[in-house]
């Protein structure tokens, strides 16, 4: 019996070969060596070569920029010529190589590893560049003067060392391609700590050290620096360095490069089809999986001319979902959001802090919450000291991936929150800021109320809990914001509910619903209840007759919204509850269900 048990326990599991998912991978050589699924972006090499030689490209975090940079480095590296077929065979550029492939010496810098503290920035930049410059001398020794490494190390600092290397390469007739990833890394410190602004300006203007480094890059273009490719998440630093690096071209908003980072829906469909067919995972059709993923990961647009043609999925989010879907053997991830995708906390803290500097009727965040969109001019760049300008602020939100292009409104660019991952980040942060300002609640008690809401249809205690928290927390400043604050606070609290995807101002055929608690039935198949909430606000001094009029308006509206096709299809097997809530000041005076 023991032997049988052992045989059963250690029986080899059947394995179906499939391509690995390159989740979190940024090294192109590793992706190809390990036979990972690679969405082919190599056709953009032709577009890049047709562009100006000093290429500036920014995208939000986790959009595949670093992997694209890695691919470009392997394509152009003279030392990788004998591996061209291994790395690029079967890809577009492998079948259509350009004359420039494998003809460059590569200098690769990643400012993400440099200490972002301005007090240590010069030391960190020098150390990182020195490491990379020494590596450059070692791997390309056969193409360089014999004593170049020793002489380079005698030079003082990154700028002088780079200048020396480029001049020596010119003597030997070698071309150099410079890649800089996360060039704006230390800008994060400035955004999170505005007190550092003076030090930042000193570094990026006049005789500042970073300015000197980019001046060196500019001067090297007259010698051997043939191409430069720079990536980051914000145009702020480059704008401040512009007069020092005014030969670069910003292609971040260009139509032809809209799809270079991230995945198109066609890319996602092909990937899903490959894995579902290869592994025989047919719990959901590809169409059903797309329908599930789209609200969470899609809807980015990086060029005005691309609006209405195609939208982009965040590639990291897609890979996270598919990786979990496979490992769970065809079951959906319990959490649609991977922790590492969340925006850097301090960066988002800065955004909200800057937003609070606006008057309440001009607040960008409040407009997003109340209207579902904001309108403004999309700036290609702006200096750090002008982040507080409304158009600059909404542009910064755009570059960070917090809003995306959604057409035009009254002659300006229209921006919306792109998807539920971003919405969750934004409202969770708002909830955290409330907590930091003395909002206190029992998470265990709140969790019980959320479960009762989803499984027992006990809605009144849940909304009373939100109202009680709102009343206790609200300050005089918040009371002045009135409806904006009440709506935003309610949304933030409902966004912290794992059973629902709260949709604000859901556009239905008949109009707009304040909050639709869209049930995540695919994640919680046994949940029973969903909710559509019409929220009305009266000032403290308004009459009871006015409050009653708001109540009647809410009843008519919630009935109409609940019958829309969008809502009826989303609730699936759950029972829909039509709830109206009326606040008078910060007091909830009506909370009832409409039959």
Where is each model-derived feature located?
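Extended alpha-helical interface modules used as scaffolds for assembling large macromolecular complexes
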Residues: 248, 308-554, 560-562, 592-595
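Substrate-engagement module of ASCE P-loop NTPases
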Residues: 164-171, 199-226
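Nucleic-acid nuclease catalytic cores
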Residues: 547-555, 559-592
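P-loop NTPase motor core
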Residues: 40, 74-138
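Walker A/P-loop-proximal flanking segment of P-loop NTPase domains
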Residues: 6-77, 85-94
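Conserved P-loop NTPase mechanochemical-coupling segment
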Residues: 23-26, 108-158, 186-201
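Structural recognition of the conserved hydrophobic beta-strand(s) that form the central parallel beta-sheet
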Residues: 179-181, 211-212, 226-233
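Amphipathic alpha-helical segments of the small helical/lid subdomains adjacent to P-loop NTPase cores
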Residues: 237-244, 251-323, 368
């Amino acid at each position: 019996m023991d032997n049988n048990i052992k045989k059963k326990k250690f029986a080899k599991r059947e394995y179906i070969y499939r391509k690995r998912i390159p989740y979190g991978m940024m090294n192109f050589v590793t992706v190809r060596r390990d036979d990972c699924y690679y969405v082919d972006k190599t056709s953009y090499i032709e577009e890049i070569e047709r562009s100006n030689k000093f290429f500036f490209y920014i995208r939000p975090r986790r959009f595949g920029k670093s992997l694209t940079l890695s691919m470009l480095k392997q394509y152009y590296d003279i030392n990788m010529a004998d591996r061209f077929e291994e790395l690029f065979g079967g890809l577009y550029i492998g079948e259509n190589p350009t004359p420039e492939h494998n003809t460059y010496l590569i200098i690769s810098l990643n400012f993400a590893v440099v200490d972002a503290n301005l007090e240590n920035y010069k030391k960190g930049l020098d150390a990182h560049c020195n490491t990379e410059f020494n590596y450059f001398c070692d791997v390309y020794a056969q193409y360089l003067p014999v004593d170049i490494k020793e002489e380079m190390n005698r030079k003082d600092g990154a700028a002088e060392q780079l200048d020396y290397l480029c001049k020596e390469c010119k003597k030997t007739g070698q071309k150099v391609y410079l890649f800089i990833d996360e060039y704006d890394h230390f800008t994060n410190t400035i955004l999170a700590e505005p007190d550092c602004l003076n030090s930042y300006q000193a570094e990026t203007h006049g005789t500042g050290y970073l300015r000197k480094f980019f001046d060196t890059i500019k001067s090297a273009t007259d010698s051997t620096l043939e191409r430069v490719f720079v990536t980051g998440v914000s145009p702020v630093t480059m704008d401040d360095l512009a007069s020092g690096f005014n030969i670069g071209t910003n292609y971040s908003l260009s139509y032809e490069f809209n799809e270079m980072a991230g995945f198109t829906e066609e890319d996602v469909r092909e990937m899903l089809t490959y894995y579902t067919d290869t592994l025989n995972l047919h719990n959901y059709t590809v169409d059903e999986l797309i329908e599930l993923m789209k609200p969470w990961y899609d809807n980015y647009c990086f060029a005005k001319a691309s609006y209405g043609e195609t939208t982009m999925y965040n590639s990291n989010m897609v890979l996270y979902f598919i990786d979990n879907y496979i490992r769970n053997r065809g079951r959906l991830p319990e959490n649609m959001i991977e922790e590492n995708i969340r925006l850097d906390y301090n960066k988002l803290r800065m955004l909200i802090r800057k937003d609070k500097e606006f008057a309440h009727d001009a607040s960008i965040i409040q407009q997003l919450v109340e209207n579902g969109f904001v309108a403004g001019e999309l700036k290609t760049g702006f200096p750090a000291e002008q982040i507080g300008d409304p158009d600059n602020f909404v542009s910064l939100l755009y570059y960070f991936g917090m809003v995306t292009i959604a057409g035009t409104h009254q002659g300006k660019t229209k921006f919306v929150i792109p998807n539920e991952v971003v919405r969750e980040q934004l409202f969770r942060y708002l909830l955290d800021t409330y907590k930091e300002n003395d909002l206190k609640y029992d998470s265990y008690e709140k969790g019980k109320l959320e479960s009762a809401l989803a499984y027992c249809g006990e809605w009144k205690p849940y909304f009373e809990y939100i109202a009680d928290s709102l009343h206790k927390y609200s300050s005089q400043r918040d009371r002045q914001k009135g409806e904006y604050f009440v709506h935003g606070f309610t949304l933030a609290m409902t966004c912290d509910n794992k059973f629902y995807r709260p949709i604000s101002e859901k556009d239905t055929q008949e109009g707009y619903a304040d909050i639709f608690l869209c049930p995540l039935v695919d994640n919680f198949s046994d949940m029973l209840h969903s909710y559509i909430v019409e929220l009305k606000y009266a000032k403290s001094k308004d009459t009871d007759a006015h409050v009653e009029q708001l109540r009647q308006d809410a009843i008519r509206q919630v009935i109409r919204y609940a019958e829309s096709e969008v809502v009826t299809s989303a609730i699936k097997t759950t029972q829909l509850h039509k709830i109206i809530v009326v606040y008078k000041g910060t007091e909830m005076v009506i909370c009832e269900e409409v039959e």
